[in-house]
A protein has these predicted regions:
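An N-terminal-biased, well-structured beta-alpha scaffold segment characteristic
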Residues: 1-42, 174
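Glycine-rich Rossmann-fold phosphate-binding loop(s) that bind the pyrophosphate
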Residues: 106-107
Length: 286
């Protein structure tokens, strides 16, 4: 789908009540302008929580245990490469247990991930978000809050990103941010590709400042960085974080539920969607 910008939105008829997306992201639509035209924008929030958090969990394991390096060696079908990699992996890999997972953005997906990483992998959970979770939730998840991204980056052994893409988060993880991370630390991105500056990430990996990275999303998606693709310490997937049949079904169901909550049988407004994104601009519109 192309970009839904102000010019395109201006051509929508006044009968349009809601833009119900069968997906979670909304960086391709100007949701504020939709709201100003008295059009709700609702996404499929919640439908992909399980799948994306599972993907992030796998990527955390991969960057600690060097799974991609091992898989590439096994696929050569070369006994010498197999044996050399088998021996080498044990000298550079670590168990995640006891390490600090730095979670950037503490929404539904990352809260599920935090639970899984703490309970299944024994990791310590630290997080940063512009809105702090309530104390009960922090206690249940064993999560420690940091009031600045910089402070979180300084103490994390692995950083996992869970933010939407907007003007505030594009290149959020740039050269300066990466320089704050511990030498030998790791980064996982299942959010949106442009949240991480690609050139800065390549440099941090080439210099050894970061020991590994895992990306389900890419800066120039669907184009993958050839430099990152050539690195054995980088796990790459094709934006399949939510890629499960259950997720697709739930996205479609959520979209229909949002439409039915808003639009009456004669096209009249009945109420608000279940998962609104642009409430502020919608309610401010005349």
């Amino acid at each position: 789908m192309g970009q839904w910008d102000a010019e395109l939105i201006s051509h929508l008829p006044p009968s349009v009540r809601i833009f119900a997306s069968a997906g979670a992201g909304f960086n391709w639509a100007d949701v504020d302008v939709l709201g100003q035209h008295k059009i709700w924008y609702a996404n499929g929030a919640g439908a992909s929580d399980e799948a994306v958090s599972d993907t992030a969990l796998y990527m955390i394991l991969s960057v600690f245990r060097n799974f991609t390096r091992s898989q590439l060696a096994a696929r050569t079908a070369d006994p010498e490469v197999f044996t050399a990699t088998h021996k080498m992996i044990a000298t550079i890999s670590h168990n995640p247990r006891g390490h600090i997972l730095g979670v950037v953005g503490f929404g539904n997906i990352s809260k599920k991930l935090a639970f899984k990483a703490r309970v299944a992998l024994g990791m310590e959970i630290h997080y940063f978000d512009i809105v702090r979770a309530d104390s009960k939730e922090e206690e249940e998840l064993g999560a420690t809050y940091h009031d600045s991204l910089d402070e979180l980056l300084k103490i994390a052994d692995c950083v996992t990103l869970h933010t939407p893409l907007n003007k505030h988060t594009q290149d959020l993880i740039d050269a300066r941010a990466l320089s704050l991370m511990k030498p030998g630390s790791r980064i996982v991105n299942t959010a949106r590709g442009p949240v991480v500056n690609e050139d800065a990430l390549v440099h941090a990996l080439e210099t050894g400042h970061l020991s590994a990275a895992a990306l389900d999303v890419h800066y120039h998606e669907p184009q993958v960085s050839p430099k990152l693709a050539s690195m054995e310490n980088v796990t790459l997937t094709t934006h399949i974080g939510g890629g499960a049949l259950n997720t697709r079904i739930n996205f479609e169901l959520n979209a229909m539920k949002n439409i039915m909550a808003v639009v009456g049988p004669d096209g009249e407004f009945m109420g608000e969607p279940i998962t609104p994104v642009n409430r502020k601009d919608f309610e401010a519109a005349k």
